[in-house]
């Protein structure tokens, strides 16, 4: 089994998260994608909504998307949501699965600042979402990591080895640009605008019913 993992504050979850995840799932032939809300994000400010509210929104989205599941492993932890700790737990939970941690290129270029970042490759593969035509400069310190671990998507045509899951590779997927951010959505909602083009109906319905993000 091949499992994608997309973490985030999801405050709120929107098409800028969902559409790239769908494109990655299709491009790599993943069996499922876990959407994983952070509880205590180590690289961001605390979310506006409670963990329970964000879990509810993500659960509602997963209920409408085939092959997507809510992962609450970080939400149930009262310590910072370090990726390496999470992936170690997931590799134990899914011992025969190949894990694919999905991240934007904007996060990858700062990977060296993450807690025990080099150990991440011992538990999972990375999937980098990038805009078509964008490339990391040769001078960037992460370029050597990318070159050393880069793998072609075609190598995934062969089924995974059940008892010998492969990790440590980096796959790059060109995704459709999404000019959407949670900050923009929160700002719009605060002044009474309804961003129907940015949110799934089930998410918007929950936000309106609970009167969230009102200033």
From Swiss-Prot:
Belongs to the NadD family. The gene is nadD. It catalyses: nicotinate beta-D-ribonucleotide + ATP + H(+) = deamido-NAD(+) + diphosphate. Disulfide bonds: none annotated. InterPro entries: Cyt_trans-like (IPR004821), NadD/NMNAT (IPR005248), Rossmann-like_a/b/a_fold (IPR014729). GO terms for molecular function: ATP binding; nicotinate-nucleotide adenylyltransferase activity. The keyword NAD applies. The keyword Nucleotide-binding applies. Transmembrane segments: none annotated. Pfam families: CTP_transf_like. GO terms for biological process: NAD biosynthetic process. It is an enzyme of class 2 (transferase). HAMAP family: NaMN_adenylyltr (MF_00244). Catalyzes the reversible adenylation of nicotinate mononucleotide (NaMN) to nicotinic acid adenine dinucleotide (NaAD). This is Probable nicotinate-nucleotide adenylyltransferase. Keywords: ATP-binding, NAD, Nucleotide-binding, Nucleotidyltransferase, Pyridine nucleotide biosynthesis, Transferase. Pathway: Cofactor biosynthesis; NAD(+) biosynthesis; deamido-NAD(+) from nicotinate D-ribonucleotide: step 1/1. Its EC number is 2.7.7.18.
């Amino acid at each position: 089994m091949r499992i994608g993992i997309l973490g985030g504050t999801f405050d709120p979850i929107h098409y800028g998260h969902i559409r790239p995840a769908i494109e990655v799932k299709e491009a790599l032939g993943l069996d499922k994608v876990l959407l994983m809300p952070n509880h205590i994000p180590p690289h961001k400010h605390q979310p506006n909504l409670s963990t329970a509210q964000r879990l509810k929104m993500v659960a509602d989205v997963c209920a409408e998307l085939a092959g997507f599941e809510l992962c609450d492993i970080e939400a149930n932890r009262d310590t910072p949501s370090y990726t390496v700790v999470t992936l170690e737990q997931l590799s134990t939970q899914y011992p025969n699965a190949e894990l694919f941690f999905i991240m934007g290129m904007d996060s990858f270029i700062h990977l060296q600042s993450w807690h025990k970042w080099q150990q991440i490759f011992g538990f999972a593969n990375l999937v980098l979402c990038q805009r078509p035509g964008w490339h990391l400069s040769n001078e960037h310190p992460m370029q050597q990591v990318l070159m050393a671990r880069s793998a072609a998507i075609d190598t995934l045509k062969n089924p995974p080895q059940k008892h010998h899951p492969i990790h440590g590779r980096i796959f790059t997927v060109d995704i459709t640009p999404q000019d959407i951010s949670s900050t923009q959505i929160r700002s719009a909602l605060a002044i009474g605008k309804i961003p129907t083009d940015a949110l799934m109906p089930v998410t918007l319905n929950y936000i309106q019913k609970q009167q969230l993000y009102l200033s």
